[in-house]
Every structure is written in structure tokens, then in C-alpha cells.
Amino acid sequence: MSHGGKRRSGDGGSEGSSYSPLVYLKRPYFRKSRSCPLAQCPDEDIDYKNKVLLSKFVSEYGRILPSRITSVSARKQKLLARAIKRARYLALLPYC
């Protein structure tokens, strides 16, 4: 009995090739590296009193944005987190 469906070529036929979705991606395991937006900024500029700079790295809900979103280096992310927490403690930035 036939199921009524048409058989497509490449559905595991006898060609010996298997389907791989990675064939259709340009570069499957390649991530484009982005430079740190604070690379030109010295460490002294990342300060708890600099509300304009700190507010760029805080979400609308008051949470610190992760470095995978902001593409900030690990060192600058640590300095930013410390400055944001100090600014929150001194009521310069909101907690939420």
C-alpha cells in the first residue's frame, strides 16, 4: 500500500550521502569578533559618578547587561559592574 506521499530525492536514498544542515551555513562555527566599545576609554573614566556612561550598560529594568550583548572585555565588564553597584548604593542609579 502506498502512503500517497511523493518521494523526494535525497531522503536517505542509496547515494551514500547523508543530510547535514551545516552544509547550508556559510561558516557554522565562526563568530565574528567585535572590539570592545570601551577600548579607547581609560580605566579612570569608568567611575560611579559617570551616570551617562553607566546607563548605557544597564537595561531598562535596571539590570547590568552581560558582556556577550555589549561586547565589553572582561576587565572593563568587571570595572563597569563595580561602578554600577557603587552608583546604586549611593542612589545615583536605580536598582530596578
Swiss-Prot record:
Single GO term (MF): small ribosomal subunit rRNA binding
Cite a single Pfam family from the UniProt record.
Ribosomal_S18
Region called Disordered, residue ranges: 1-20
**GO BP terms:** translation
Per UniProt, subunit arrangement is: Part of the 30S ribosomal subunit. Forms a tight heterodimer with protein bS6.
* Cross-referenced Gene3D superfamilies: Ribosomal protein S18
Domain of life of the source: Bacteria
Which keywords label this protein? Ribonucleoprotein, Ribosomal protein, RNA-binding, rRNA-binding
Question: One GO CC term of this entry?
Answer: cytosolic small ribosomal subunit
Q: Which family does it belong to?
A: Belongs to the bacterial ribosomal protein bS18 family.
Full protein name: Small ribosomal subunit protein bS18
SUPFAM superfamilies (UniProt xref): Ribosomal protein S18 (SSF46911)
NCBIfam families the record matches: S18
Q: What does this protein do?
A: Binds as a heterodimer with protein bS6 to the central domain of the 16S rRNA, where it helps stabilize the platform of the 30S subunit.
